[in-house]
Amino acid sequence: MKITKIEKKKRLYLIELDNDESLYVTEDTIVRFMLSKDKVLDNDQLEDMKHFAQLSYGKNLALYFLSFQQRSNKQVADYLRKHEIEEHIIPDIITQLQEEQWIDDTKLADTYIRQNQLNGDKGPQVLKQKLLQKGIASHDIDPILSQTDFSQLAQKVSQKLFDKYQEKLPPKALKDKITQALLTKGFSYDLAKHSLNHLNFDQGNQEIENLLDKELDKQYRKLSRKYDGYTLKQKLYQALYRKGYNSDDINCKLRNYL
């Protein structure tokens, strides 16, 4: 087969053959196979050229994808599939990128976890889930997590939550709120509980009473539209108790309120 035309098309070259076949190749392919107009290729040479062209093009795509941020092996492979790189070529591209240290799942996991320690708020369980979603294997994640101390981060997150809610919730509800938030963020129950030891939940009686008054007014406005009498009183009690207020304090307020 003879090359009848070579034309540059942006980042690729269009090659046309005398059997009416055409294909796009990279500049690396042109150089490697010394392609030029009127050059004759046998079947083996043509197949080698096609394979290298896919490999070269796929690698260039991957490097473009990696230029924005670190990616996992799986993320790069998925990106190549999306751009219709042949499936049997993808492992070769991934291997080259690994050998040249463009991708490294262990380093990616380490960087992701360290960045979270500096400016994130996620515990180990959530971090592991996010890394697994990127296609990183547990054996690349677990050793790094086990060597990372999350106690200071848990304290920082709990302090932020404490500052946000301390003027809105009584001590018990505030503790429950912080604990649940830390669990949702992926911290262990023990770590969440331990982080509470660094917070001051000793609100004064007047502060708690003021919070109770505000919550009672709020619940009354909502519940009095549907209920009255004894049912309203019971509904108010249940709502306030769920918010973490003391049973005796609630009953005292309700006696004077209704």
UniProtKB/Swiss-Prot annotation:
Principal place of residence: cytoplasm
GO cellular component entries: cytoplasm
Alphabetized UniProt keyword annotations: Cytoplasm
Any Pfam family: RecX_HTH3
GO biological-process terms attached to the record: regulation of DNA repair
Function text: Modulates RecA activity.
Protein name: Regulatory protein RecX
Organism whose genome encodes this protein: Streptococcus pyogenes serotype M18 (strain MGAS8232)
